UniProtKB/Swiss-Prot annotation:
This is WD repeat-containing protein PAC11. InterPro entries: Dynein_IC, WD40/YVTN_repeat-like_dom_sf, WD40_repeat_CS, WD40_repeat_dom_sf, WD40_rpt. Required for viability in the absence of the kinesin-related CIN8 mitotic motor. May be a dynein intermediate chain. Interacts with NUM1, when DYN1 is present. The lineage of its organism: Eukaryota, Fungi, Dikarya, Ascomycota, Saccharomycotina. GO terms for cellular component: cytoplasm; cytoplasmic dynein complex; cytoplasmic microtubule. The keyword Repeat applies. It is found in: Cytoplasm, Cytoskeleton. Keywords: Cytoplasm, Cytoskeleton, Microtubule, Repeat, WD repeat. It comes from the Eukaryota. The keyword Membrane does not apply.
């Protein structure tokens, strides 16, 4: 019974559902009514539509067109497998090419790494800042670099890294720059070049205007430039150091210790108008142990005031290690021997004096040129010195160029004052310079065993002498168009024994730099001078 009741109940429910479905089909917008209850819907109307299915006459049958379906592109890969056997020679060749390419790549990479490492390890140089000296006391330290270096070498100890001469030394670096002092506002008064170390020293002088030369606010300026270069002209060189002296007029600059190229110290002796001499030193020192190596240029100056008159001559007489000596002379006739290392006095000042008049009374009948010159000098208490020369071939004598134009051969090793000799120790030429002698320099002629002496003067002439024979060995003196300030020997030119020539360089007061060629004539046994530039 209960089963029948359940079936009846289900039939009733099914019938109600069918009736509700019929009512819902009469209202198509009933689905949206729940979302828009306020919206008013129009009544549904029935529309009949007829569709023709028969084909009209004369119409063409159109073929059905297939719909275009867009398909995704599919990428496929073909894998080929070689089944033939590869020849052994071709395989070996391919392996060789691969190995060669790999080695080349590794070599190139190694070279690039080494190059980068070498550039990073390249030593660097730090120059000292320009220095200005305004006081009379110009000494920086009494412990000179040259003395310290010599003591280390004499003790037998190994020199420290800052004293060793290696490939990174200042003297051997290739440096290019153009930093020379401008010559427009300065006058070049001294120039010295050391080819062994490739160092050029140039001294410039700047004077106040003529209308202000006595003003208290104006003073003379001297500028010393030290240049690393490959030639004496100073072109394409690097300015290593520069020192300015305010109120000091430097007369000469001489490079000392030339015969010690292994030294790491540059020694320069500066002579001033007031008689002060300055030992100006430069050395290279490693800053600190680091990579890359950094070198610093250090400067030192030792000043001494031994003279009361202008210093006009500086001659190095000994180049023995730890015994380097230099002769320094003032224009009033004082001569002193000093150490090149620290300017220590090795021989007290000696005064050059003329022959006493009492000794000349016995020579009244002697009318030679030298005796007449001695008689004129006897009126004074001293002999003015303009220049000086020295040669190791005759070490006991020193040659003096006088302000009166004479050339005097003086015996150096004598106590007390230095007196001129009555016979000038064998040097009595028939002719001599008429005015101040500005330069003397020796040269040894190996071919003819001659000791040649080159001299120049403000009388516009350059002369050549045989120092041992005491006579001139030129047909006529070389006459230039102005006063000559300095002359020095250049390299030799050997073109055979009879055609051998010598060269010298001459500086004139008008700024000209002249090169003179001296050719020996075997017939006359004389030298002939020719200006070649």
């Amino acid at each position: 019974m209960e089963r029948l009741k359940q079936l009846e109940e289900k039939r009733r429910q099914l019938k109600e559902l069918r009736e509700r479905r019929k009512q819902a089909s009469l209202f198509p917008g009933s689905e949206t009514m729940g979302h828009h209850p306020t919206e008013v819907h129009a009544k549904a109307t029935m529309v009949s539509v007829s569709v023709q299915t028969d084909m009209e006459e004369g119409s063409k049958i159109q073929e059905p067109q297939s719909a275009y379906l867009r398909r995704k592109e599919v990428i496929t890969y073909d894998k080929g497998i070689q089944t033939d056997q590869i020849e052994e020679e071709q395989l070996q060749e391919n392996e060789n090419h691969t190995t060669t390419d790999a080695v080349a790549i590794e070599t190139t990479a190694a070279d690039e790494n080494n190059k980068d490492k070498a550039e990073n390890d390249q030593p660097r140089l730090e120059l000292a800042k320009p220095f200005l000296v305004e006081e009379a006391a110009a000494t920086l330290s009494n412990a000179s670099f040259a003395r310290l270096e010599t003591e280390v070498s004499a003790s037998g100890q190994q020199a420290p890294s800052n004293m060793q001469q290696d490939k990174d030394n200042l003297m051997q670096w290739n440096m290019v720059s153009e930093n020379l002092q401008s010559e427009t506002d300065c006058d070049c008064i001294a120039q010295e070049y050391d080819p062994g170390k490739g160092v050029l020293v140039v001294v410039y002088l700047r004077l106040p205007p003529a209308d202000l030369q006595y003003a208290s606010s104006e003073a003379a300026w001297s500028v010393v430039n030290v240049v690393k270069c490959d030639n004496a002209s100073g072109r394409n060189g690097l300015l290593i150091d520069m020192v300015e002296f305010r109120g000091t007029r430097i007369m000469t600059a001489t490079i000392l210790r030339r015969y010690h190229p292994e030294s790491n110290v540059i020694s320069i002796l500066l002579a001033t108008l007031t008689g002060k001499i300055i030992l100006y030193e430069l050395r290279l020192k490693q800053k600190k142990p680091e990579t890359p190596v950094v070198y610093v240029v250090q400067r030192n100056m030792v000043a001494r005031h031994y003279f009361q008159h202008p210093v006009v001559a500086v001659i190095e007489t000994s180049s023995v290690q730890d015994q380097e000596r230099v002769l320094v002379a003032a224009d009033n006739g004082n001569i002193m021997e000093l150490s090149c290392l620290d300017l220590t006095v090795l021989r007290k000042p000696q005064q050059l004096r003329p022959v006493p008049l009492s000794q000349l009374l016995s020579l009244e009948n002697d009318t030679c040129t030298y005796t007449e010159r001695l008689q004129r000098l006897a009126k004074f208490d001293e002999v003015g010195i303009a220049c000086m020369a020295y040669t190791s071939e005759d070490p006991q004598y020193v040659w003096i160029g006088g302000e009166d134009g004479g050339i005097y051969k003086v015996f150096w090793d004598q106590p007390g004052p230095l007196y001129l000799s009555l016979d000038n120790n064998g040097f009595q030429p028939a002719e001599n310079h008429s005015t101040r002698v500005t330069g003397l320099e020796f040269h040894w002629d190996d071919a003819r065993r001659l000791m040649l002496l080159l001299s120049c003067s403000t009388d516009w002439t350059v002369r050549l002498w045989d120092a041992r024979a005491g006579k001139a060995i030129i047909g006529a003196p070389l006459l230039l168009g102005g006063p000559v300030l300095r002359a020095r020997w250049l390299e030799k030119n050997n073109g055979g024994e009879n055609s051998r020539t010598l060269r010298c360089q001459v500086w004139c007061a008008d700024g000209r730099l002249v090169v003179v060629n001296w050719a020996f004539d075997a017939k006359t046994s004389l030298y002939t001078a020719t200006v070649i530039s």
